[in-house]
């Protein structure tokens, strides 16, 4: 087991009261960064230490996320030797030396995660010296890494124009079909103003609602008087189908989700023929709803049925409060040949290697009212909107 002296040493580092002989500087007092994960902290940088003073773990990796989580960068170090609780120092290159910017601990998989407010930097992580089972484990450093070296931005839309521009366009305009016989995407529900894309939901007028109900009655055999009992709605959906496709990479968007229930906002991806895995990197059903927010994958089953692989988002600070829904949040999904990693505001919310797609997908942003959920919709709270500040894609160079 990890001996207690290393724990005390780590606590002393956090307090800024000991000299660390392995990185050659006195650790500065640290304070948690807003929104950072437990166990990760950052504060006033320590003094620099010369390059190359710590032996490298040649099998270790250091991943620097390209996503700007509202001023924070996520860095994940993975060491070849897993020692749960082992203190790890994240350092950025500063001139000819290294400057400590955060402290964390290894988990049982040998990983240590950091949130730091220093975005454009070259980093390394140092697993500090500890004693385990009566043996000293020497300090080891990961290879250095930076987001600029690991990622290249290949797509960006900040919705700065007055109208929707390529490659996004309205999808399925005016089309009513299951599971939305009583709602359809409409161009009028897509608006841009001051760099914000707003996707809306609104109840339609009596005249058009009557036409929709008559159409539903013809399709389903239901009496028109009983069709769409919860109302008829205009929805919004845009996508890059036929214009932009991506296979693997990191997709992120800064968004504000509607708090109203009876509808769902989604940032998702689909193949052009719709036969492969649908990737819902964020789907939101409103404040207080049973589904809440989800990271979800929808592969096809043996009989072409739609399956669900994913999880509800529960571990993001503040998500259970009403105020959270009035703010913008950055949602990301990293998709690689090894699997998917989902994050909200930099917090990992779901990770899986299941339902892994290898095919190109296009991007979709939508706010929809499906027939199965409109019984929870309160028309007095309409119109509602799903607001998007930007959406970006990065890939490995």
Region roles according to the model:
Residues 2, 11, 16, 20, ...:
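Low-complexity, Ser/Thr/Pro-rich intrinsically disordered linker/stalk segments at domain junctions
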Residues 6-7:
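Twin-arginine (Tat) signal peptide motif
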Residues 146-397:
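GH16 jelly-roll
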